Amino acid sequence: MYPPKASGDPAAGAAPVTGFPVGGPAASSQWSSGLLDCFDDCGLCCLTCWCPCITFGRVAEIVDRGATSCGTAGALYAVLAYFTGCQWIYSCTYRAKMRAQLGLPETPCCDCLVHFCCEPCALCQQYKELKARGFDPVLGWDRNATMLPPSAQGMGR
């Protein structure tokens, strides 16, 4: 009903910010889950094992900040998987991009080897990392992007 009292700190009422840092590279941090923690989320694990193109598409859309849609990335992943079996090369580039954006270490080994040896585990780990950072990959980039609240409007006739 009443506006909050002003304090000396201009950031006192600011909402916490999640997602990708703006500007330079992120400070170094750790993965929120291990590579083999894919079985912690049974639904995600099943989706990724049976339809990895969906999990990959969702991750790619968030990592590309909406420049690539989930459908486009997922379809390209599926075509590469079906015709060449080398979809892991495509998906490892997104792991590298995500690590650079979030300041994550290249563990347990190089990105391409992680995706070559255990593609479903790598995709689950990336998906779970985005969720831990405040994104909901199901919603896509547009619905995850921060929007300003509507301005207060006066009474109209």
Swiss-Prot record:
Q: Recite the UniProt keywords alphabetically.
A: Membrane, Transmembrane, Transmembrane helix
Superkingdom of the source? Eukaryota
- Give coiled-coil spans as residue ranges: none
Q: How does it sit in the membrane?
A: Multi-pass membrane protein
Q: Which InterPro entries match?
A: PLAC_motif_containing
Question: What's the main place this protein lives?
Answer: membrane
The record's subcellular location field reads: Membrane
Q: Does the keyword Transmembrane apply?
A: yes
Membrane-spanning parts: 41-57, 66-83
Show the taxonomic lineage: Eukaryota, Viridiplantae, Streptophyta, Embryophyta, Tracheophyta
Q: Which family does it belong to?
A: Belongs to the cornifelin family.
Protein name per the record: Cell number regulator 10
Found in which tissues? Expressed in roots, leaves, stalks, immature ears and silks.
